[in-house]
Regions:
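Rossmann-like dinucleotide/flavin-binding elements
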Residues: 26-37, 47-57, 63-175, 203, ...
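N-terminal Rossmann-like dinucleotide/flavin-binding domain of flavoprotein oxidoreductases
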Residues: 1-41, 172-198
Length: 277
């Protein structure tokens, strides 16, 4: 996601720490309840996270091939066309809109696991000169302009994006108080059309039909639809009510509570349960 490249360093830090501490990591391994019981663990920490909420069965046409979750888009599993509708204007919806309109976004399928261990690798980020042009910050040191600001360069977005939410009111009102204005400014300057109070009627090969906040039926002619309508906890590994497993189970992170999940809360959950054990 543009602007979040620094989080890569956090991931790389944990990978190196796990290796340094001798933690055994098993990838591409399907885990089930029987495997956990057979292993005779004393504690099992379920940090299985979340999956994007699907609209299949809830919205006509949600199973069409041009419809995808934000995870499918960002992983590179699916790609979008030149016109895109984003369903959901929470934090993820804004992130996806920025990713779709910025020139320096990079899908995860371009990042092999070997790059995470390469100390010289850094995600492709916006250059300083590009940042100055976008935000109208002059590089002159004589401060001939007020506040060192000039008129920003006109931005030609790489695709047309519609960002929609069901509730009425300003989009992005629930974003972070210190940086939310940056995200709102980005989508505005990149020509993202913001739609509030939308009722999603159906998705067809023509695009997505909505009822706008004035009660009028409207067709948004888009090539692709990205669903950012929240996420759901993955808890299949937790014991059922009445089970008596040998291990003590702990549920943390998004698996514990999917709503409003962020990295800070997930890391804190992990630290607290580890300290308790």
């Amino acid at each position: 996601i543009p602007g979040k490249e620094e989080f890569f360093e956090t991931i790389r830090y944990y990978i190196n720490e796990l290796e340094h501490l001798g933690v055994e990591i098993k990838l591409n391994t399907k885990v089930d309840k029987a495997m956990l019981e057979k292993a005779k663990f004393h504690h099992v920490i379920v940090a299985t996270g979340v999956v994007p909420r699907s609209l299949a069965g809830k919205l006509e046409g949600a199973d069409l091939p041009q419809v995808m979750s934000y995870a499918e888009l960002l992983s590179g599993e699916k790609s979008v066309g030149d016109t895109v509708a984003v369903i959901g204007a929470g934090g993820i919806g804004f992130d996806v809109s920025e990713y779709l309109t910025a020139k320096h976004g990079q899908p995860l399928d371009e990042l092999g696991p070997e790059l995470l261990k390469d100390p010289s690798y850094r995600p492709k980020a916006q250059s300083v000169s590009e940042w100055r042009e976008e935000w109208g910050v002059t590089s002159d040191t004589d401060y001939q302009t007020e506040g060192g600001l000039i008129k920003p360069e006109a931005i030609k977005p790489i695709r047309q994006v519609y960002l929609m939410q069901r509730t009425k009111g300003r989009l992005g009102s629930g974003l972070n108080k210190t940086s939310g204005w940056v995200h709102r400014a980005h989508v505005k300057s990149h020509g993202v059309i913001q739609v509030s109070g939308a009722k999603y009627d159906k998705i067809t090969n023509e695009g997505i039909w909505i009822t706008n906040n004035q009660g009028q039926s409207q067709l948004l002619r888009v090539d692709s639809v990205v669903v950012c309508a929240g996420q759901e906890s993955v808890v299949e590994l937790m014991p059922n009510v009445g089970d008596a497993p040998d291990a003590q189970y702990h549920l943390i992170g998004g698996a514990k509570l999917a709503a409003e999940l962020d990295a800070k809360r997930a890391i804190r959950d992990g630290a607290e349960v580890a300290a308790a054990i």
